[in-house]
Amino acid sequence: MRTRDTTLLTPWIISFWVQTSALFASFHNQNRLSASSTGANDRLIGIVGDRRIMSEPSPIAPAEGKLGILTPGMGAVATTFIAGVLAARKGYAAPTGSLTQQSHIRLGKRDEHRNPLIKDFVPLASLDDLEFGGWDPYSDDAYAAAMKAGVLEPRHIEGIGEELRMIKPMPAVFSPRWVRNLDGTDQVKPETTHVDQATALMEDIDRFRADKQVDRVVAVWCGSTEAYEEPSDVHIDLDVFEQGLKNNDEAITPSQIYAYACLKMGVPFANGAPNLIVDIPAMVELASREGVPIAGKDFKTGQTLMKTMIAPGLKARMLGINGWFSTNILGNRDGEVLDDPESFRSKEVSKLGVLEHILQPDVYPELYGDIYHKVRINYYPPKGDDKEGWDHIDIFGWLGYPMQIKLDFLCKDSILAAPLVLDLALFMDLATRAGKSGIQEWLSFYFKSPQHAESIHPENDLFIQLTKLKNNLRHMMGEDLITHLGTEYYDES
């Protein structure tokens, strides 16, 4: 019997084993790539230095024709987003804060110096090809709504005033049971049953497609925070949910009716609020059945954005935390809605969950096992959209000596949220054309409470989220994934 001499293979095997071991250690500590970040069916075919080489992805359909963006809710966030895109199209202002428009992405090895803009690397819809629509319980057109919101100065709105006036919201599915503290709503759909409301929304989507002559449509929730709700029996699976629509089940919310209508019409849906929407089993099932992407939830903008920057740094240096007190002052419509205790509860749950998964108190009980974490939101009308987020953090270091961090972030809530709406719309459209469906965890970068598979915890570290997002883009385009191992620059062979 002939035997094969494997002597020449031994160095290669050892090298491959060493690099693989180092790679997995690196992933565990810093670049934990879940199945959703590379695709559950992707096959690892090799590792070269700090690059993870995967099997070829599916082709991406080109971004031909127009993309329609529907926003349930056309208040401060939606109109700031729309006005910003229109201004950028005319060259009046830059789309600052948008990864799709301004961020570069590294490709290959560092010494190759390949760093294209994301929008030049992946086939995204052009800003010139976007059309806008949406629903709102107030009948103000986008111009009037933007002026009332007071986010943008009139001089920034007037140059695009004609286009804004042409964007009129469709009558909304709305219930004061789920969104309180809003008075004077003047265009609510007359349909009284859930199934009729869903049908009316689907007809709206069809009409929007025809009127705007768009080839594709995505939806991004920009509406108000609904009262807190735990999943109930009607949310367990799609058949039960659809029966609940027919029976007018009181546990089905307006936002869930929007999501159902969109997914049934093949429209990807991203949830920018803490509402229970596409993160119920029934919607996950529907998205999978229809082959439509979903993502959520709750735009990560002001105070929570800062938390997901600061907490990873403290953890990286193994600095302990005794307490983290956060308070917010804001005076826009969002603040008015959140002045209701039940709506605030939805936001509180979303904001409180961030630190736990970053700090891992079960792994580091001596550092983070006894944190006192409190979040407060205060409605103060004079603030308008100029939100103030104040954080007091009690930390401890070497030998347990105490220290403090105080952060006062004076931000404009809608200015931070608007580029997220743009990026999510373009990336959800990209995901659709790339054949992706169901939960898009790679978009967790944009959310306070990222939607994820039931078997894993969410990833809230902003920097790991960005690595996940960019590696997904690299994989879509057949580029090597970046692991930051970097050993190939120091090989002594």
Residues of each region from the PLM?
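Residue-identity detector for glycine
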Residues: G39, G46-G49
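Conserved anion/nucleotide-ligand pocket segment
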Residues: K297, T301-P365
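Acidic, His- and aromatic-enriched active-site or binding-groove loops in soluble protein domains
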Residues: Q243-A251, E290-Q303
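Glycine-rich, aromatic-lined ligand/substrate-binding cores of catalytic
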Residues: S350-G353, H357-E441
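Metallocofactor- and cofactor-centric catalytic cores in central/energy metabolism, strongly enriched
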Residues: S55-M265, F269, P281-E285, T308-A311, ...
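Short catalytic-loop micro-motif centered on adjacent basic/acidic residues
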Residues: F269-A273, I294-D298, N322
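Low-complexity, intrinsically disordered or signal/transmembrane-proximal segments
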Residues: Q19, H28-Q30
